[in-house]
Design a protein with these regions (language model features):
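C-terminus-biased signal that marks the final domain/tail of proteins
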Residues: 3-28, 33-362
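Long, intrinsically disordered low-complexity tandem-repeat segments
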Residues: 363-415
Length: 423
């Protein structure tokens, strides 16, 4: 990946986590051709949102760090170079914003305090250390901790913050007019409407390498979705995973759990935490079953051929589990929908799944019956043509009078010329 960034570059910044059975690497792509990747310490945990967190990193530690050769030079040349309190090159401050965006701050703070309630962090901290040690050194995080992190909506903060997707939502005894008063309480939660397909990857060093660990699939919004385990060596997936419709499809796994979340989030006064509690009970059972499956297949770790031979079995088990759970989801969805209808609530997943700017076509106006054709008025007979008046004969041409002979010209009398002078 680093080679691709060096050769091709990156149009934007991103964070990538790469892991296998031996180690986990955290990589910040700093845009352009710059990047820094570090090996995650085995005794640390990290909570990170959509921003940069790496502070000072020893770029010469080639065993634990992979970085672009000009990462520090480019920051200096661009004028964005920043240092920590000890004068060392600070990656996040040099390549990221001066302050955390509010949505990044709220999620980072919520995640740290959820996983480590005794942590000394505050909401106003200038920066959050990326790799952290739990206050309790004996703390071991579980799958359920990871699920809870993805779903969290500030429940553990005792009302200090409210998810900002609740702005304008009527609360008991409140018509929404208190939104302005509670402005500072509304924050961007970890479990928000934009967090979809937030899976959990469990790397198990005791499984055959070809299994690739376990993917705890969380289709749909993380707020109210169940996590279901699948190995990475499946040869096929259940039919409900295959529809690719852009709006609600009752045969789709994604759209079914999306609808369940949609009903739960828009009717919290009805469902409260019951949906999450239902999934948590289901997940406890799935974790027990998955541990038994892991114990069965770990015997094949050092036998690649035997591990490959059970791929059909693993696939069949996954298809059977998917079918069973999907039928349960459909039943649960139907019960929630029926309950809302009984309460007189509206619930139309087809309409709700359409984009906000979608407008239903206006119904066609009913065709008006044509007015009966009025009979044409009878044609009035034309008036009889008046006979033309007889042409009066032209008067006879009178003969011209005979030309009289000219009188003989009398000779002119000569008169003397008189001249008058005008005054």
């Amino acid at each position: 990946l680093a080679k691709v960034i060096e050769e091709k570059g990156s149009a934007e910044g991103n964070t990538v986590v790469i892991a296998d059975q031996k180690e986990t690497w955290y990589m910040e792509i700093l845009s352009g051709h710059q990047y820094v990747a570090v090996k995650v310490p085995e005794d640390k945990y990290a909570v990170f949102a959509n921003t940069y967190y790496l502070g000072h990193v020893n770029l010469n530690d080639t065993e634990n760090v992979i970085a672009s050769k000009d990462v520090e030079k480019v920051a200096k040349e661009s004028g964005s170079y920043k240092t920590d309190k000890d004068g060392n090159f600070h990656i996040a401050k040099s390549y990221g914003p001066e302050k955390y965006a509010e949505g990044d701050r709220s999620r980072t703070y919520a995640g740290i305090t959820l996983l480590d309630p005794k942590s000394k962090v505050t909401y106003e901290d200038d920066e959050y250390e990326l790799f952290r040690s739990p206050t309790d050194p004996n703390k071991k995080f579980t799958l359920e901790d990871a699920f809870a992190l993805q779903r969290n909506r500030f429940e553990h903060l005792n009302g200090r913050f409210v998810p900002d997707d609740q702005i304008g939502v009527k609360k008991q005894g409140d018509n929404g007019s208190n939104d302005a008063v509670r402005k500072d309480q509304y924050k961007y939660a970890l479990g928000n409407e934009n967090v979809i397909d937030a899976h959990v990857y469990q790397i198990n060093p005791n499984l055959p390498k070809s299994f690739g660990g376990t993917l705890w699939l969380g289709m749909g919004p993380s707020r109210n979705t169940p996590y279901v385990p699948f190995y990475g060596n499946l040869k096929d997936t259940y039919e409900a995973f295959k529809p690719q419709t852009a709006t609600y499809d009752p045969n789709s796994w994604y759209w079914t759990v999306w609808h369940i979340d949609n009903m739960a989030i828009n009717n919290q006064d009805v469902f409260g935490k019951s949906v999450q509690d239902h999934w948590k009970a289901l997940e406890k059972q799935l974790i027990i079953e998955q541990e038994a499956s892991d114990a069965k297949y770990k015997a094949l770790k050092d036998n690649p051929e035997a591990a490959k031979a059970v791929e059909d079995e693993v696939t069949a088990n996954a298809l059977a589990l998917s079918k069973k759970l999907f039928e349960h989801f459909k039943s649960y969805e139907a019960d929630m929908h029926a309950h809302l209808i009984e309460l007189g609530r509206k619930d139309d997943p087809y309409r709700a799944s359409k984009p906000d700017d979608y407008k239903d076509p206006e119904p066609e106006k009913p065709v008006q019956p044509e007015k009966p054709v009025q009979p044409e008025k009878p044609v009035q007979p034309e008036k009889p043509v008046e006979p033309e008046k007889p042409v009066q004969p032209e008067k006879p041409v009178q003969p011209e009078k005979p030309v009289q002979p000219e009188k003989p010209v009398q000779p002119e009398k000569t008169q003397p010329i008189q001249t008058k002078v005008n005054e």
